[in-house]
Amino acid sequence: MKKVDVKESAVGRETRIRKQWNEQSIFEQSIQNREGAQSFVFYEGPPTANGLPHVGHALGRTIKDVVARYKTMVGYKVLRKAGWDTHGLPVELGVEKQLGISGKHEIEEYGIEPFIQKCKESVFTYEKQWREFTESIGYWVDMDDPYVTLENPYIESVWHILGTIHEKGLLYKGHRVSPYCPSCQTSLSSHEVAQGYKTVKDLSATVKFEVKDSENEYFLGWTTTPWTLPANVALAVHPNMEYVKAKQEGHVYIVAKERVQDVLKEDYEVLSVHKGEELVNTSYMPPFPMKEVTNGYHVIAADFVTADSGTGLVHIAPAYGEDDYRVVQSEGLSFLHVVDEKGEYTEAVPFLKGKFVKDCDVDIVRYLAKEGLLYHKEKYEHSYPHCWRCDSPLLYYAGESWLIRTTAIKDTFLQNNDSVTWYPDHMKHGRFGKFLENMVDWNISRNRYWGTPLNVWECESCDHQFAPKSIADLRKHSTKETPEDLELHKPYVDEVQVCCEKCGGTMTRTPEVIDVWFDSGSMPFAQYHYPFENKELFEEQFPADVIAEGIDQTRGWFYSLLAVSALYTGKAPYKRVLSLGHVLDEEGQKMSKSKGNALDPVDLVEKFGADALRWALLVDSAPWNAKRFSERTVLEAKSKFVDTLINVYSFYVLYANLDEYNPHETYDVKRTKLDEWVLSRLHSTTKKVRTALDDYQFTNAAREIAALVDEVSNWYVRRSRNRFWESGMNAEKAAAYETLHEVLVTISKLIAPFTPFVAEDIHVNLTGNSVHLEDYPVVNESLLQPKLEAEMNAVLQVVELGRSNRNQHSLKVKQPLAELVLLEHNENDMDWESYRDIVMDELNVKTFHVELDETKYTSYQLKLNFKKAGPKFGKNVNAVNGWLKQLSQAEVQNFVSTERAVYEVASGEEVVVTAEDVMVEKVAKSGFSNTTNGQYTVMLDTNVTEELLQEGVAREFIRAVQEYRKQLNLPVNLRVDVILDTEEELQQTLTNHKELLKENLLVKQFTFGHLTNEDDELSLGETKVRIKLSSAN
């Protein structure tokens, strides 16, 4: 076995391992070895390569890699196809910035074709960084044969899906109000909008709408979007709600009865009460009269009006609200549009023409105040949608869009979701399920350039539509020969004209591209160019057994996958969804570059290694929980887990090489109870880890492994060191080597999905084989010994209590103590005699015994809990307190047992004192200190005699010399002669313990003499010791 370089950096080790993997094609072999096995399917959510990875990507890639590696090791064939999301507005915006242009007008001036080419060139700007990041973090995914959403085969599959949806009558062109980004100048779908809500404070206004032909009488309407008021065409009331006419300061106001107090506040007189339906058709004077409104400016009835907020009257601007649009359509009212595609007022509002509407709320309110039409204004905090791509506030515009009738198959969506297992479970019928319940038809079209062209051709003569499902289908209907290498992007497909089969007229393609979420939602099919190729492969790889992405994909990719599959096949595209929580900074704030609190995962890997980063992300908390994260978290994972494991592995290799131990040879072995215990722990942990991983409980699995590694390092190896240090090879020493070898090899397999680099390093060095080509460990039931594990756990508890006891009294473990007494509080069949030597050695005590009668070593004190007892006993509280203090120990013991006592106060009244009235404090016998965990109490004799003190000094000297040997890098088996120069008192102490020193320090001869300043010096508290070592071999 190669010597372990414990000083090798994590990134150095991982680079070396990656090189091995590449040279030996380990990733490819891991898949080939499962050829013919049952498939386990996961889908890679496609990132965009025009932005750099962040810590959230590290979490997602870690989880997916753990799943894929684990499932491979338990026998499945797991294909791992990478993907790239290459279309969409972020790409266009990046190119605009690069070219120094902005907006559609300048794009079209620049030229659509060159612009599209620039987009194509830019999408892989950071591909190299993504590939390096993916490899450095140990995520095994096929990046040499990815699916790419801009490629013709992918787009052709998307066209087949859209053509099928059109064929089903579910794709239609409609005029409706949709969320619109004036900055990007395109509409958005409802699931895109759901990703971008922010809490903002906007100026709200309560507006006076003067009743026509009535003096000083006004309807009061409240709005949080004053900018929509110039487009007002009606006021809406609920027909069954009660409204009042109330007089205030000479004016009469009409407002919902339930809202009058909140709106008018005070000093008003209710004149009359009316049903909403009585107010219908009442005309009013609009604050911004428009001659285009030939049917409007009167009250209408609408069921969506409530009295939850505002005035109970809703101002209706049909161009900018979904409910408004619907009710105006049904009422046949005029339609008014006063805003252009850039979100600026048109000449319809002359005094604000060319201004961005969201910046004009103050101007509108000032105008209303000037005209005497403002009743009240205030800042109003509410949730408002923003563009998920550019962060601009959205507007709601009425316009023509292509929509998919998702509402027509809503039941299919809901049924498919019911078949899915969600992690966490509450997402299923919570965040995701509620979104499905409230779905609207999917606005699929975007008035942009760089995207999958919507494959619908419309006849200029008869409006007939044709939706080709393939390139061949398009060629077949084309009016002229199309190029063999036709690229399925604007402007190339726009040049293809089709002959209308209905009237013989010319059909041209509708100019829109599609929602990029439809692109990525089509990947189960399009990644294999289905249905044109790979039908068997597709059927083998559909649906996914699991997908895993960030929680922000709930209304993104998770939804689009479900929607596309339901529309196309009627089936759910996945069986399980792992919805991963946000990775926050250590203060619980969302990470962002602008705040300066973002962690770069590439930097973290460089500093601490990928294993440490992966382990930190997994062991901290369940991946679907939001987690606070920092460099400290990763450093802790490295030191507590990765480095601990490497130290154990290094220890084994060092001594096995010294003893020329060969795990492939047969030795006479005699396993100790400690060996049996660690093997039982190994296999019980294996059982728990497999159960956890089968249920995707990664954190539970990681914590089980962490506990095992800690116990192997800090208990098994430490308790076995003397066996490894013995000269020669006896049966117990061979058993220690055999056991630790088995433990390390099995642990390397257990951790292979979690920390693949250190797992590989250990396994290759100990066995010669890649751990990633091995099967996952299975439980050997014959090695499980629950009783032994329980007993050793009890020993560990007692040792931990003893250490805590020593710490409380600043007594180092190197300082021997005379006695340890163990008090047991629960009956059990623990055979402490079998573990006497371990406890005594671990806690460095001369005697140890178990005591059942705790009164020999402890007494109790009762103190009144005044917070509880004061109100209960009132004026008698001080008398009760005095009585408690003078109780005998027998009476105190009785109270502790019964938790009840009766005391007669001076007045003759009896008061009952119970456990909740009293605080019970356990006091150790004089000269002893105690620590307890409820099950055990450890009593230590803290009196240190001169003899014990001297032995403690000798043991502290042993520690100092062992540390000194490490600093000199002396071989661990090198025997030395020691010359010491120190004061006489310390010389005598060390002489008295010469055999103890020789036994622990591999010393052949101790002498005392004069050493010069050139020799090294050790410190033992205040005492200095000069020392010189020389080889005695």
Swiss-Prot record:
Catalysed reaction, written as an equation: tRNA(Ile) + L-isoleucine + ATP = L-isoleucyl-tRNA(Ile) + AMP + diphosphate
PROSITE patterns the record matches: AA_TRNA_LIGASE_I
EC number: 6.1.1.5
Motif ('HIGH' region): 47-57
Highest taxon in the source lineage: Bacteria
Entry's Gene Ontology molecular function annotations: aminoacyl-tRNA deacylase activity; ATP binding; isoleucine-tRNA ligase activity; tRNA binding; zinc ion binding
Subcellular location(s) of the protein: Cytoplasm
Matching CDD domains: Anticodon_Ia_Ile_ABEc, IleRS_core
GO BP field: isoleucyl-tRNA aminoacylation
Keyword terms of this UniProt record: Aminoacyl-tRNA synthetase, ATP-binding, Cytoplasm, Ligase, Metal-binding, Nucleotide-binding, Protein biosynthesis, Zinc
Subunit record text: Monomer.
PANTHER family: ISOLEUCINE--TRNA LIGASE, CYTOPLASMIC, SOLEUCYL-TRNA SYNTHETASE
Name of the protein this chain belongs to: Isoleucine--tRNA ligase
Gene, per the UniProt record: ileS
